[in-house]
Amino acid sequence: MKARHKRLGLIVAGLAALGLGAALVLSAFQKNLVFFFTPSQVAAGEAPRNRSFRVGGMVEVGSIERQADGVTVSFLVTDTAQRLRVNYRGSLPDLFKEGKGVVAQGKLTADQLFVADEVLAKHDENYMPPEAAYALKQAGAPALAGALK
């Protein structure tokens, strides 16, 4: 084999390895990508089925129900236009309260129940994830979204 053919073979093998590595990285990134949806988007059918995603909005006042086991909690997340029932089994953040911002990550069941694996509460009185503030503004609650930037 000539030296020129060896170099060409090494270049082709290197490019193939680089392409394979890039494909593996992109595949792993795609599997770990989690999208954010509002209750209105979930109600409109825009949220994926059988795939984890995040839903965010405000915890509806009077909607928190704690089960007898002391670990399971059910509550409504609203963007003022729609609301979504969320079930969570685990310890809630200290800042989790009615009327406050929340982001839950989990999956949607066939009967429109969101089963959360993780619940995140806003960390101070002035913070709201940009996606949630935008969603509230789009849902017709600009004063609420502006107050919670």
UniProtKB/Swiss-Prot annotation:
GO cellular component, one term: plasma membrane
Record field: transmembrane: 8-28
Gene Ontology molecular function terms on file: heme binding; metal ion binding
Primary location group: membrane
All ranges on the Periplasmic side of the membrane: 29-149
Membrane topology, Cytoplasmic segments: 1-7
Residues annotated for heme binding in this entry: 123, 127
Family the entry assigns: Belongs to the CcmE/CycJ family.
Entry protein name: Cytochrome c-type biogenesis protein CcmE
Organism of derivation: Polaromonas naphthalenivorans (strain CJ2)
Lineage of origin: Bacteria, Pseudomonadati, Pseudomonadota, Betaproteobacteria, Burkholderiales
Gene: ccmE
